[in-house]
Regions:
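RNase H-like, metal-dependent nuclease domains and their acidic two-metal-ion catalytic environment used
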Residues: 1-78, 84, 88, 101, ...
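Short, surface-exposed amphipathic charged segments that create phosphate/polyanion-binding patches used
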Residues: 87-96
Length: 169
């Protein structure tokens, strides 16, 4: 092999992921806050999202728009502390195969871009392996969902189907 082949960094296949509908490429220096909120409104229709949990990044711009659309907002003020608090839940979920990304290479890419740092006290934080090309936004969104995962109602569909079976039409 040539030296350049072994050291060449692989770029994420962004266009391929866009064609699969896993992401949308925005032509501009930043994403318009209305576009972000509009995406969440669409997801609310599919998944019943009512609450947005996020760190402080851009929330000064996004908060009024989210509130206007009827979302509840919770801001994680110390993301590093949140990393440490959620680390056991995240580690357990991955270790016990409770996380299934399905056929979504984008989420695997986000997760594989994360570097777990453990300080001298044993506290863990989730950092980027490399600052420029290694995006972790999807992993952080996943992590922040776990911040309030205990608020999600676990519904027993078997009971509902049993009840429907008892109804005579």
């Amino acid at each position: 092999r040539k030296a350049s082949e072994t050291t060449k960094e692989k770029f994420a296949p962004i266009r391929e992921w866009e064609e699969k509908g896993l992401l949308t490429v925005i032509d501009g220096p930043t994403i318009d806050p209305k576009t972000v909120v509009g995406w969440f409104v669409e997801q609310r229709e599919k998944y019943g999202i009512t609450k947005i949990v996020a760190d402080n990044f851009r929330m000064d711009l996004l908060r009024p728009l989210f509130l206007e659309e009827g979302f509840e907002i919770e801001v994680i003020r110390n993301p590093t502390a949140a990393d440490n608090l959620l680390a056991p839940r995240i580690e357990d979920a991955f270790a016990n195969n409770h996380i299934i990304f399905g056929d979504n290479p984008l989420m695997r890419w986000y997760t594989n871009n994360v570097l777990v740092k453990t300080n001298g006290d044993g506290n863990k934080s989730y950092k980027k392996k490399e600052e420029v090309r290694r995006k972790t936004d999807g992993f952080k969104a996943f992590e922040y969902c776990l911040w309030r995962a205990d608020e999600i109602i676990d519904y027993d569909y078997d009971d509902a189907f049993d009840m429907l079976d008892e109804i005579e039409f």
